[in-house]
Amino acid sequence: MNKGLLTLLLLFTCFAHAQVVDTWQFANPQQQQQALNIASQLRCPQCQNQNLLESNAPVAVSMRHQVYSMVAEGKNEVEIIGWMTERYGDFVRYNPPLTGQTLVLWALPVVLLLLMALILWRVRAKR
């Protein structure tokens, strides 16, 4: 009985790391590389901090297949990322554009660093 249980446990362990594999057929290796590059730049809207290649959420699979089909249609990276941004918002981009809304996010670290340097300089000047 213990031998059978151990065999069953080992069998399940082999399949514990199984993942979903995309079987999308590309016309050439360049298209495949382009599609994978674009999908790695886009964030899954459902899973925090995972790109479309890493996530197996249904929305990520759908978005990944959309990227693949758009690459197969001959669309370039700018068109595909633009379409995804239009549909899902700037959140899907790992590098959001510099706009009025994101300016605070880009400028805040620099402002805080300068503020800390000023405070440190004043404290040292008093001594």
Swiss-Prot record:
Pfam families: CcmH. Transmembrane segments: none annotated. This is Formate-dependent nitrite reductase complex subunit NrfF. Belongs to the CcmH/CycL/Ccl2/NrfF family. Not required for the biosynthesis of any of the c-type cytochromes. Possible subunit of a heme lyase. The keyword Transmembrane helix does not apply. One of its GO terms (molecular function) is metal ion binding. One of its GO terms (cellular component) is periplasmic space. Residues 1-27 form the signal peptide. Heme binds at residues 44, 47. Its main location: periplasm. Disulfide bonds: none annotated. It is found in: Periplasm. Disruption phenotype: Triple nrfE-nrfF-nrfG deletion mutants no longer attach heme 1 (covalently attached to 'Cys-122', the CWSCK motif) of cytochrome c552 (AC P0ABK9). The lineage of its organism: Bacteria, Pseudomonadati, Pseudomonadota, Gammaproteobacteria, Enterobacterales. InterPro entries: C-type_cytochrome_biogenesis, CcmH/CycL/Ccl2/NrfF_N, CcmH/CycL/NrfF/Ccl2_sf, For-dep_Cytc_NO2Rdtase_NrfF. Keywords: Heme, Iron, Metal-binding, Periplasm, Signal. The keyword Hydrolase does not apply.
